[in-house]
C-alpha cells in the first residue's frame, strides 16, 4: 500500500499536482558541483555576507523576433525554450523544475554529508542516512525481488468471505489511510475549523482521473490497454501465472471502471459545499447496509460517532455496489492494487515496469531520474521537515524573510485598495472581504515548530520495504492522533525546501516555503518590477485563492460560511462562469480543449495575482522616476518577469494527462490567456485590435 500518503485538509498549491484529494500527497520535489561550475545563484546561501548582482531578466531567454502583441509567452520565453530542449527524464521542464532540481541537489549534499559519517541511532540524521542508503542499494532490493510482498499477498489469498474482506480492508486502512476502495483521514471540520473530525473520501483510481474509465475515445482505450499490460507485467513478476495475472488485471480494471461510474469528477471535487456532508455513523449505517460501516470503524479501533462523507453520493452508490460485489473479484482487485502501490519500493524490474507505463506512456517521459534523485525524493517524502531544518540554516537568510514580509504586507494593501474600488460589490460584502484579508495568517520560509519524528522507527536492521512501511504507519498514526482534538494551526503542509506555495481555507493562511524564495521568483538584488512580477504575483495568487470560487465560501476564521449578499454572490458567479467558458474555448492539443471549470480557481487566482501585484508595484513606485532597464519600462519588466515563471517544454502526453486532472492551466495559458484579460498589459505593450493578444474590452474578464 505504498507510496506514502496520509490524511490532510484541502490546500491550494500554486503550481503542483493537486492536493485536492483528502490525502496530502507528499509532493516534494551535488551542490558542490554546482558551486564549482558557477551554476548555483550566489544569493541562495544564508551563510554569505555579500551577494553578487543577479540579472532579473535574461534577454537571451527571450525571442525578440516574436511580437509581444501576438504571442507574449513565446516572446518572453522563446530563447529559453530553444536552449532547453526537454530532458529525457522529464515530461515537463520549466522554471519550477530548475528550482526543484537546485533544491534537490542541495538536499543531496546535506544527505551525503550525513551518510559519510556514523550517526547515532534514534536521531533524525540516522533515519535519513539509513533510508537513503537503503534506497540506493539496488543490489539488495533486486535480491529480495517481490519477497517483501509475500505476507500481504498470502493474507489476500486467505480472504474467502465478506467478513474476511472487511477485516483486511480495516487493517490496511488503519495503516495506510488511503485504501483501494475508499480513503479516510482526519482534518479540520470546515464549518467548525478549530476542531478536527474524521472523514471518508472516494476511491483514488489507479489512473488518477475517472475520464479514462468512462470515456470511449481511442486515447482512453489505449491508456486502459497499457494499464492492463502493466498490471499483468507486475503480477507475473510477483509469481502469478499468465492466466492468473490476466484474470487479476482484468478484475482490477473492471472494478475501477465500475467505481469510476459513480466517482466525482475532478471538477466536482473542487466544490467545497458538495464535498461537505456531516453524517452520524449510526444514521449512515442504518440507511446503507451493503458495507458494515460501524464494524469497519470498530475493527480499526476508532471511536467515531460523526464523520464527513465528503463525496456522499459516491458512498451511497458504493454501499449498494459493494453488497453485490463478488469476494473473489474484490480479492483480485486488492491484489492488483497492493502490488502496483508497492512497485516503486521493490526491485528494479518492478520500478521499470511502473515507469514504462506511468512515466512513458501516460506522461511521455523517456527515462527515469537517476537513482540518487529518486532516493532523495523518498527521504524527503518521509523526513521532509528534518531535512528542511538543515536546509533553511544553510540556504535561507533572515533578510529574505524580512523582505518577503514587507512584500506580503504591500500586496495586502493593494488587494484592500482593489476591493474598495470594485464597482460590482456592495459595502456590506466589501466589509467582510476586508476583514478576511486582514485576518490572513502569513507563513514564510519555515515553521516555528518542527515535526517530531521520535516515534518513527527506522532501523538499519530492517529491510528497505519494512522501513517504508514503518514510515507510512508513523504518518497515518500522526494524522489519526488529531481526531477530536483542536486543529494545530502551526503545522505546515509543505517542507521548507519545496518550490511551491499554498493557501489553506480552513486556517485562512498563505504559506511561502523557503524553496520558492529564490531567483527568478524572488531576488533580493533585482529591481521592484521583476520581484513584483514574479514573487509578487505568487503572493497575490495565494491571497486571491481566499476569494476564488472555493475560498470565497470560507470566512475570516476559516469556516465555510456565506459572508456575501445574495446579489453580490450572483454577480460573482456570473463573472467566474464567463472566465471558465473563456478558458474552455482554448485548444491545448489536437482534438482537446482546456477545462475551464476544473482550472477556474487557479485562473481566478492568476488574474487576481497579476492585478494586485501590478497595483502594488505602482504604489511602490509612486512619486519616483524609475528608469528603463535594458530598454524596458517597469510595467514591461513586470509582465516579462511573470511570463518567465511559466516558460517550459512539455510532451503532448503530459498536456493531455494534466488537462484531465490538474486544476492548474498549462503554462502557455497562464501567460497568453490570462494576460489577454489584463488592461494594463495592453497599455504596456501597445496591444491593438489587429493583434493576436487582443480581445475586446467587453470580453475581458477580471474578477478581483
Spans of features found by a protein language model:
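Intrinsically disordered, low-complexity linker/terminal regions across diverse proteins
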Residues: 49-50, 282, 287-290, 308-315, ...
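Short, low-complexity intrinsically disordered segments enriched in A/P/G/S/L with frequent Arg
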Residues: 8, 12-13
Amino acid at each position: 500500500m505504498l507510496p506514502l500518503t496520509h490524511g490532510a485538509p484541502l490546500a491550494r498549491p500554486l503550481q503542483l499536482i493537486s492536493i485536492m484529494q483528502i490525502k496530502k500527497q507528499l509532493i516534494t520535489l551535488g551542490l558542490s558541483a554546482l558551486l564549482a561550475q558557477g551554476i548555483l545563484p550566489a544569493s541562495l546561501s544564508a551563510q554569505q555576507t555579500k551577494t553578487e548582482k543577479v540579472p532579473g531578466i535574461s534577454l537571451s531567454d527571450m525571442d525578440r523576433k516574436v511580437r509581444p502583441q501576438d504571442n507574449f509567452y513565446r516572446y518572453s520565453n522563446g530563447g529559453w525554450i530553444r536552449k532547453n530542449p526537454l530532458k529525457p527524464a522529464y515530461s515537463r521542464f520549466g522554471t519550477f523544475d530548475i528550482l526543484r532540481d537546485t533544491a534537490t541537489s542541495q538536499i543531496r549534499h546535506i544527505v551525503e554529508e550525513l551518510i559519510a559519517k556514523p550517526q547515532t541511532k534514534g536521531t533524525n540524521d540516522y533515519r535519513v542516512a539509513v533510508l537513503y542508503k537503503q534506497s540506493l542499494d539496488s543490489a539488495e532490493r533486486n535480491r529480495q525481488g517481490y519477497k517483501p510482498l509475500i505476507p500481504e499477498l498470502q493474507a489476500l489469498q486467505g480472504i474467502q468471505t465478506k467478513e474476511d474482506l472487511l477485516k483486511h480492508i480495516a487493517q490496511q486502512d488503519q495503516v495506510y489511510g488511503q485504501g483501494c476502495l475508499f480513503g479516510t483521514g482526519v482534518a479540520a471540520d470546515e464549518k467548525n475549523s478549530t476542531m478536527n473530525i474524521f472523514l471518508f473520501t472516494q476511491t483514488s483510481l489507479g489512473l488518477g482521473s475517472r475520464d479514462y474509465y468512462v470515456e470511449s475515445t481511442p486515447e482512453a482505450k489505449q491508456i486502459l490497454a497499457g494499464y492492463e499490460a502493466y498490471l499483468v507485467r507486475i503480477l507475473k513478476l510477483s509469481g502469478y501465472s499468465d492466466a492468473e495475472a490476466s484474470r487479476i488485471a482484468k478484475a482490477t480494471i473492471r472494478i475501477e471502471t465500475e467505481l469510476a461510474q459513480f466517482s466525482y469528477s475532478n471538477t466536482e471535487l473542487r466544490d467545497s459545499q458538495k464535498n461537505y456532508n456531516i453524517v452520524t455513523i449510526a444514521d449512515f449505517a442504518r440507511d446503507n447496509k451493503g458495507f458494515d460501516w460501524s464494524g469497519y470503524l470498530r475493527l480499526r479501533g476508532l471511536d467515531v460517532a460523526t464523520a464527513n462523507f465528503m463525496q456522499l453520493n459516491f458512498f451511497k452508490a458504493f454501499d449498494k455496489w459493494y453488497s453485490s460485489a463478488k469476494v473473489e473479484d474484490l480479492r483480485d482487485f486488492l491484489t492488483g492494487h497492493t502490488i502496483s502501490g508497492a512497485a516503486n519500493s521493490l526491485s528494479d524490474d518492478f520500478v521499470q515496469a511502473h515507469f514504462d507505463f506511468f512515466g512513458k506512456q501516460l506522461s511521455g517521459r523517456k527515462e527515469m531520474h537517476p537513482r540518487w534523485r529518486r532516493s532523495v525524493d523518498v527521504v524527503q517524502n518521509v523526513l521532509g521537515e528534518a531535512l528542511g531544518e538543515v536546509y533553511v540554516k544553510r540556504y535561507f537568510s533572515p533578510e529574505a524573510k524580512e523582505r518577503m514580509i514587507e512584500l506580503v504586507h504591500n500586496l495586502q494593501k493593494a488587494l484592500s485598495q482593489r476591493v474598495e474600488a470594485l464597482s460590482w460589490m456592495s459595502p456590506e460584502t466589501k466589509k467582510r472581504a476586508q476583514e478576511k484579508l486582514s485576518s490572513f495568517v502569513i507563513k514564510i520560509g519555515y515553521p516555528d515548530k518542527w515535526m517530531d519524528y521520535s516515534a518513527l522507527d527506522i532501523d538499519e536492521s530492517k529491510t528497505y520495504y519494512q522501513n517504508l512501511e514503518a514510515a507510512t504507519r508513523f504518518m497515518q498514526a500522526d494524522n489519526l492522533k488529531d481526531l477530536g482534538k483542536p486543529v494545530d494551526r502551526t503545522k505546515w503542509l509543505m517542507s521548507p525546501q519545496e518550490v511551491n506555495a499554498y493557501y489553506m481555507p480552513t486556517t485562512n493562511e498563505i504559506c511561502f516555503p523557503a524553496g520558492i524564495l529564490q531567483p527568478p521568483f524572488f531576488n533580493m538584488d533585482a529591481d521592484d518590477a521583476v520581484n513584483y512580477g514574479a514573487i509578487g504575483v505568487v503572493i497575490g495568487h495565494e491571497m486571491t485563492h481566499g476569494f476564488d470560487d472555493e475560498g470565497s465560501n470560507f470566512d475570516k476564521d476559516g469556516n465555510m460560511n456565506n459572508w456575501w449578499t445574495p446579489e453580490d454572490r450572483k454577480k460573482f458567479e456570473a463573472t467566474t462562469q464567463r472566465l471558465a467558458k473563456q478558458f474552455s474555448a482554448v485548444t491545448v492539443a489536437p482534438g482537446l480543449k482546456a477545462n475551464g471549470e476544473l482550472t477556474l480557481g487557479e485562473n481566478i487566482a492568476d488574474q487576481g495575482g497579476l492585478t494586485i501585484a501590478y497595483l502594488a508595484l505602482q504604489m511602490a513606485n509612486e512619486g519616483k522616476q524609475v528608469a528603463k532597464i535594458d530598454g524596458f519600462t517597469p510595467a514591461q519588466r513586470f509582465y516579462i518577469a511573470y511570463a518567465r515563471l511559466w516558460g517550459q517544454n512539455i510532451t503532448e502526453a503530459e498536456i493531455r494527462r494534466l488537462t484531465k486532472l490538474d486544476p492548474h492551466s498549462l503554462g502557455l495559458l497562464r501567460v497568453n490567456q490570462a494576460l489577454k484579460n489584463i488592461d494594463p498589459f495592453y497599455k504596456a505593450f501597445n496591444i491593438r485590435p489587429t493583434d493576436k493578444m487582443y480581445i475586446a474590452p467587453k470580453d475581458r474578464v477580471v474578477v478581483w
